[in-house]
Amino acid sequence: MNPSHIIKLFIGGVVATFLMAGAAQAADQGSAAEAEAMAKKAVAFIKANGPEKAAEEFTNGKSFKDRDLYISYLDFNGKMLAHGSNPKLVGKELMELKDPEGKFMVKMAIDVAKTKGKGWTEDYKFKNPTTEKLQEKAMYVERVGDAYVGVGIYK
């Protein structure tokens, strides 16, 4: 076999390995469309079942968790009503919560919910609960009464 042919096969194998690894990682992460769908499902659940039952389901149930997607449910004062990944955050006032670059994550989400009713925040950094690493993230938020639900995607 020609040495240049062997090198081309080797390089092709390396490229294929990286592509498959990237596809596997993408499959482990929720998409923007999936985040929006989960948020809309959460808003419908709140309207059908009330905020208390919804908060319990978002925090402790399984129907609003999918890979790295989960619900954050906060009032417009920044109080965490439910959190699908970290129940210790429930009841905490998080209005002043900043990412490592100084971005006020909750304030950004409240601004989108109040001014647009629904939409995406700008990117910020947050610890991914599945990888335990700090990653870029954006959150889709949707207003429900004087609160909002949010579902973020890691990038």
Predicted regions and their residues:
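N-terminal membrane-sensor/transducer module of prokaryotic signaling receptors
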Residues: 1-155
